[in-house]
């Protein structure tokens, strides 16, 4: 009797775990990030279960880099950012509830900066709109008790293409997503 119960338990465990792993990656997810850039994101998973397209809208320079040299002046404030990332998403071998992802895409920023005026030591405010490339890598956890939620941590970088080529900015953060 114990062997039969063990076989039935194993069968339900295997069927249930496959269904749980499949249900974690829904078609869409939306959430927020605390970090750089901070804000809201929406993600659309592809049918192959590996790729995703993510759009992030939020702040730029809020966590680190608020007071930083830029061209012939400095940033002294928080700006706005939007980026679109093409991602590759994989469950880890250690735990199917733990996924890794990485990707890249374009990023647009808008931020005030203060140009130095050598003649009278006053700063003139200018609006800097910039375009560049961003890359990211992260880890995401899908709790078994809350299959529609996921928690993530990521790190990446932004390098500006225009107007200040090769301006480098570290990015990353933590956040939560709702999968639906």
List each language-model region with its residue ranges.
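Transmembrane beta-strand segments that form the barrel wall of outer-membrane beta-barrel proteins
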Residues: 24-37, 50-61, 153-161
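Membrane-spanning beta-strands of outer-membrane beta-barrel proteins
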Residues: 25, 35, 77-79, 130-132, ...
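Outer-membrane beta-barrel porins/channels
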Residues: 135, 158, 162-165
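Outer-membrane beta-barrel "beta-signal"
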Residues: 169-180
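Membrane-embedded beta-strand positions in outer-membrane beta-barrel channels/transporters
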Residues: 29, 39-41, 81-85, 134-136, ...
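Bacterial Sec-dependent N-terminal signal peptides
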Residues: 1-26
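N-terminal beta1-alpha1 ligand-phosphate binding loop
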Residues: 35-45
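Gram-negative (and chloroplast) outer-membrane scaffold detector with strong preference
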Residues: 46-151
């Amino acid at each position: 009797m114990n062997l039969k119960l063990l076989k039935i338990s194993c069968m339900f465990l295997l069927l249930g775990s496959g269904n749980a792993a499949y249900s974690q990656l829904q078609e869409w997810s939306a959430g927020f990030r605390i970090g750089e850039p901070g804000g809201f994101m929406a993600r659309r998973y592809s049918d192959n279960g590996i790729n995703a397209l993510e759009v992030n809208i939020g702040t730029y320079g809020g966590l680190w880099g608020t007071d930083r040299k830029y061209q012939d002046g400095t940033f002294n404030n928080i700006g706005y950012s939007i980026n679109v990332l093409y991602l590759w998403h994989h469950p880890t071998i250690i735990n199917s509830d733990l996924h890794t992802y990485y990707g890249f895409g374009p990023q647009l920023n808008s931020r005030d900066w203060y140009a130095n005026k050598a003649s009278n030591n006053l700063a003139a405010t200018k609006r800097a709109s910039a375009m560049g490339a961003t890359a990211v890598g992260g880890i995401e956890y899908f709790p078994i008790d809350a299959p529609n939620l996921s928690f993530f941590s990521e790190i990446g970088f932004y390098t500006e293409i225009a107007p200040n080529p090769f301006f480098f900015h570290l990015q990353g953060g933590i956040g939560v997503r709702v999968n639906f």
